[in-house]
Amino acid sequence: SGFQFNMSVGYDLDGIKLEKVDRFIEGMKDASAAPIFNECRQWLLDNLDRFDNLTKEDVESISPEICNCATLSTLHGCPPQEIERIASYLLTEKKVHTFIKCNPTLLGYEYARKLMDDMGYDYVAFGDFHFRDDLQYTDAVPMLQRLQKLADKKGLEFGVKITNTFPVDVKQNELPSEEMYMSGKSLYALSMSVAQKLAKDFDGKLRISYSGGADYFNITKIVDAGIWPVTMATTMLKPGGYERLEQIGQLFKAKEAAAFAGVSAEKVEAMVEAAKSDKHHVKAVKPLPSRKVKKPVPLTDCFIAPC
C-alpha cells in the first residue's frame, strides 16, 4: 500500500490525442497486449532460479493494469481554457483519475517576492512576467470547481499537484540561458502557500499531491496534513542519494495507509509559518561548508561523501 505509478501527460490537447501518446496512455491502463510487458513477464518466469524470493505465483499475479492516474503538466503560459479541455478529455474520454500540476505563480508577484526576501532569498531574481502570463488564481478556482464536479459525475478522483518548479532569472552564468528553475528547500514555502490557499478555499475537499522541497524533515507533516502522494527529487541529488529513501521510509513504517479524508488548512497554514524561520528552509546567514570533495569520485566510491 502507499505506492503507485502516475502518468505525466502534456502539453496540449492536440499532442495528447496523437496516436503515439494515446497508445502510451492506453498501454498504461492495460498492458496485457503490450509486447514488452509480456516479454518481461515471460523472462521472469524463465529465470525464476536466479531469484531467492520470487515465485511463479508472484510473477503471474503482476497486474497488467499499471496506472489509472494522470498528472497534467502545463507549460508556463498555458491558457486556462486549454488546461480545462485537456483535463476534461482525460476524465471523460480516457477515464483516468486526473491531477493538474499548478505553478507557484498562483500566489501573485508581491506575495512571492516578499516571502523570498523574508527567508533570505532576496538575491533570487524574477520579474512579474510569469505571474501575469500564467494561470491566474481567480480563473483557477472556478475551473477546478467545474472539473471536480465532472470527476464526481464520472466516479473518478480529481485534484491538483503542488507545484511545478519556479522560473527565475540567470544572473551569474549558472546556465547558458536566460532562465533556470528553482526547486528544493527554497521552493517549499511557495508550494505550501499555494496548498494553503487551495485547502482554505475548497474547505479541504480538493485532493492535493505534492512536490516542492519535500524531505526527511517535513514529509510526515505534509502527509499528516492530508497531502499525498509526495514526489521527491532535490533531496536525492544530495549526498546519500537514493539511500535517503531508506531513512524516509522508516518514518512511515508504522503508519497505515489511510483513505483521503481531506486536507487540513490549519495544519498547512502552520507549516507555512514555521517554514519562514525553519533552518532547513531559510537561507543560512553564514555560507555552509562545501559538500564537494577534491578527489575524483568513481561511481562506487560514494562512501567518502559526508552523508
Q: Can you say where each PLM-predicted feature lies in the sequence?
A:
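Active-site entrance/lid segments in N-terminal catalytic domains of soluble metabolic enzymes
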Residues: 1-156, 164-169
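Glycine-enriched alpha-helix->loop->beta-strand junction motifs that scaffold or abut catalytic
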Residues: 94-96, 203-204, 224-229
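Conserved, mostly hydrophobic/aromatic
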Residues: 100, 160, 198, 222, ...
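Flexible glycine/acidic-rich beta-alpha junction loops that bind and position SAM and/or redox cofactors
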Residues: 104-117, 161-182, 236-243, 247
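Glycine-rich beta-to-alpha transition loops that act as phosphate-gripper elements at the mouths
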Residues: 164-166, 205-219
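Ferredoxin-type iron-sulfur electron-transfer modules and their immediate structural context
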Residues: 236-237, 243, 247-248, 252-307
